[in-house]
């Protein structure tokens, strides 16, 4: 939200289960805005809930021919988390839903980030933008979902810069840029009490990782006619990890342990080079747009997938996940009705997973097909109805030895991916009657 769009207001909210939130915002100087909020929630389970604070300082100014916009943000979270309820169809029991098997569970986290963008004209129809940024966060929580209940602390601190130039020449719009990011992170997992020879007390993991990422990208939009438009883009990215183990290498357990759960790999370096791309075509009329797009994406392995190993795995030989997708759709807008309907098909390759030996490996394939709809209807100047819905099938497309499976899962649905979900909102705004009251009734479903 820009400085000009920041309202001068104080807002107080209250809800069920001891939910309260107080927020304030306003312009505090020329091109400077400040907003802050504090909230608390009692939770619907016993001994659960959170306290959270957030603050944002934003600037929008002009300095020496440069248009400057930036923000400094911070947040703090103290949460009493809750364990999973137990029992067959326990979620249907009103009393069981409120129980908390792990009242000792908690999560404490803080984060901060800042960025400042410098933009100026470059030539007759181009502009240059330089945006340095900083981010920092840390989180400590109890792994209450595991019987041995270790405590984990993870953190990372980053500095980077995004540089881009964009312009327009006749029917062609173009964008080129470079991103660079240096991150220093780490993780410590410590177990206070002895559980078994295979899950001993003490330090399980203690490591630092320096990550450097450099990327170059470009994107073009070409208006063939007033109604036809083609877009294309590509991004090349290189990520390098420098991992340092701060504890002893190898298994955490004593040599007599039958199946040690934790393994600390030796210091190592890893690198991943990947590319993404997209090609789209759009046809516009006065009221509708028909569009199609093909795209390729990737995800480099996470540091925990590479260095937080188990069951004697000495090294994780994994590569980046890849995804290819095709999408077609139609969107339109009229005086009272707007909609966006799309269908998509996606395949993912080199999917990273834990096999039956608890090794982190890659090579799985999945397919994802679905249809999505978003629509809104302005019933009257006061009342509006909006909603979205999705139907999708997510399936394994390879015969992998997934952790917890015994037989072939090729063709099986991915049980953690819902088939149907959506929401419906009925809103009312009485501002036209000079009454500063608005309300919303929402229905959400997931299956």
Regions from the PLM with identified roles:
Residues 41, 48, 67-115, 137-156, ...:
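Flexible loop and strand-edge segments within Gram-negative outer membrane beta-barrel domains
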């Amino acid at each position: 939200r820009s400085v000009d769009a920041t309202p001068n207001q104080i807002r107080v909210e209250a809800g069920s289960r001891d939910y309260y939130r107080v927020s304030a915002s306003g312009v505090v100087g020329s091109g400077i805005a400040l907003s802050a909020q504090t909230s608390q929630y009692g939770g619907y389970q016993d001994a659960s809930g959170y306290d959270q604070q957030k603050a944002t300082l934003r600037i929008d100014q002009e300095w020496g021919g440069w248009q400057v916009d930036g923000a400094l943000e911070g947040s703090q979270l103290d949460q009493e988390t809750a364990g999973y309820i137990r029992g067959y169809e326990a979620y249907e029991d009103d009393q069981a839903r409120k129980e908390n098997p792990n009242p000792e569970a908690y999560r404490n986290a803080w984060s901060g980030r800042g960025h400042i963008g410098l933009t100026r004209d470059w030539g007759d129809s181009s502009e240059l933008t330089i945006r340095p940024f900083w981010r920092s966060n840390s989180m400590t929580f109890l792994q209450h979902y595991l019987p041995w209940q270790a405590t984990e602390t993870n953190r990372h601190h980053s500095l980077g810069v995004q540089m881009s130039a964009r312009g327009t020449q006749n029917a062609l719009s173009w964008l080129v840029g470079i991103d660079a990011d240096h991150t220093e992170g780490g993780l410590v997992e410590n177990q206070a009490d002895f559980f078994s020879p295979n899950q001993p007390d003490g330090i399980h993991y203690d490591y630092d990782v320096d990550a450097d990422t450099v990327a170059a990208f470009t994107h073009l939009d070409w208006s063939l006619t007033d109604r036809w438009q083609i877009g294309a883009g590509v991004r090349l990215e290189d990520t390098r990890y420098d991992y340092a183990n701060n504890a002893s290498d190898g298994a955490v357990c004593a040599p007599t342990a039958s199946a040690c759960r934790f393994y600390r790999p030796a210091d190592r370096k890893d690198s991943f080079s990947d590319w993404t791309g997209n090609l789209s075509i759009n046809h516009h009329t006065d009221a509708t747009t028909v569009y199609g797009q093909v795209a390729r994406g990737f995800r480099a392995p996470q540091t925990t997938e590479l260095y937080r190993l188990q069951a004697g795995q000495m090294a994780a030989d994994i590569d980046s996940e890849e995804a290819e997708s095709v999408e077609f759709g139609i969107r339109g807008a009229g005086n009272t009705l707007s909609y966006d309907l799309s269908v998509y098909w996606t395949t993912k390759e080199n999917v990273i997973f834990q096999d039956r030996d608890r090794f982190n490996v890659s090579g799985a394939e999945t397919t994802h097909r679905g249809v999505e709809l978003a629509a809104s209807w302005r019933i009257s100047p006061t009342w509006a109805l909006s909603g979205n819905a999705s139907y999708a099938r997510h399936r394994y497309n390879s015969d992998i030895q997934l952790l917890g499976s015994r037989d072939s899962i090729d063709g099986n649905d991915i049980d953690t991916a819902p088939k149907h979900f959506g929401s419906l909102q009925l809103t009312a705004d009485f501002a036209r009657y000079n009454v500063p009251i608005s309300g919303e009734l929402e229905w959400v479903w997931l299956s």
